[in-house]
Amino acid sequence: MAKKKTSSSMARSQLAALLISLCFLSLASNAVGWSRRGEREEEDERRRHGGEGGRPYHFGEESFRHWTRTRHGRFSVLERFPDEQVVGAAVGGYRVAVLEAAPRAFLQPSHYDADEVFYVKEGEGVIVLLREGRKESFCVREGDAMVIPAGAIVYSANTHSSKWFRVVMLLNPVSTPGHFEEYFPVGGDRPESFFSAFSDDVLQAAFNTRREELEKVFERQREGGEITTAPEEQIRELSKSCSRGGGGGSGSEWEIKPSSLTGKSPYFSNNHGKLFELTGDECRHLKKLDLQIGLANITRGSMIAPNYNTRATKLAVVLQGSGYFEMACPHVSGGGSSERREREREHGRRREEEQGEEEHGERGEKARRYHKVRAQVREGSVIVIPASHPATIVASEGESLAVVCFFVGANHDEKVFLAGRNSPLRQLDDPAKKLVFGGSAAREADRVLAAQPEQILLRGPHGRGSVSDM
């Protein structure tokens, strides 16, 4: 009898222990779940406020990642464009990057597996290219744009004694879309020389030199890493050989050389700002890459008239100032998780409608809805505007706005301005106006379309309250 009681007691104890364990496991699971939910909520909050992932078609400074960062300079690369955030924009294979070099900084020789198009935001420097069996040395300064072909070995330096050298660049990877690498022939621990990946036998045969000598040259540890500082006399020596046309160039239309956007006449200007551009007709290397570069200097309180590009997707990087942009978009309704769910539902509805049209002829009708994409922008912001998407950029009341634009797919592209003196809507003939606006409203439409006497760069929406980041 005692044995039965003992056995029963042990069974109850084991059952109690099991129940307690299950309770702890449940609590732990809930804690993990709460933690993960909290992380997701924090992530959603960051996205709503322009953090990682940002809002659709807009990326802030926090979306950049430092590839190199020393006291002498930084090289930062924007995260890859997520397809769900730039729907309709053919830019997934491109990357945006920013290079900043301190006074008298020197950048170690390297090459990218990507074509590079850059714009000098600030300062001056010397850029040396080693390619096709020759050396080309260029003096570049603020306002210059230039193309560097993939695979060219490049080294550069900030030639100013007190100003930083800052460059904004667009990279077009040639191996893997959206992914590029930098290769250093000379290095140590950071950066590592790519020659360190080869066997000693191969290197000794290739250079006809003993391993010990090769290590001294190619794998020597250098202080400061990829970006170092150079004595003033060495910077002067580097500057002596550089030119605006590229020493050793052929002088042909295919010659690589810097082109000044701000040194040429703007293609449009008025009291509200200036617009500059460098096209493929002026730079053959841009045409080959199907790219174009533009610069917009918008006076404070002014705006670019609502417009779209017929073929090109615009990648706009804010250089200076602040303001906001708005865009009409059929793909998304703003930003955040709720909008993504709505987008998915809308996508499902559209698929059903399209299937219905295929099955039942013309009885189905596609719903056309355009949503407002809007975000505040400041120095370092990146905006993506797909082809045919009407959009505008507005400078704040307090300061002017400078924006450099890279146009992807620019060959045969046209800009269409929808408001102002050059709006195509003004060209509607009278019968069309009566059909479009209604007979009684045709005259009123004429008055509305003719009310704006200016074009392209216009007076902004003054006196309508502050712009909130919706």
Swiss-Prot record:
Location(s), subcellular: Secreted
One GO MF term attached to the UniProt entry: nutrient reservoir activity
Keywords, comma-separated and alphabetical: Allergen, Glycoprotein, Hydrolase, Metal-binding, Metalloprotease, Protease, Secreted, Seed storage protein, Signal, Storage protein, Zinc
Ranges for domain Cupin type-1: 57-215, 259-445
Influence of pH: Optimum pH is 4.0.
One GO CC annotation: extracellular space
InterPro entries, alphabetized: Cupin_1 (IPR006045), RmlC-like_jellyroll (IPR014710), RmlC_Cupin_sf (IPR011051), Seed_Storage-Functional (IPR050253)
Cofactor(s) of this protein: Zn(2+)
Coiled coil: none
Family: Belongs to the 7S seed storage protein family.
Record's protein name: Cupincin
Organism: Oryza sativa subsp. indica
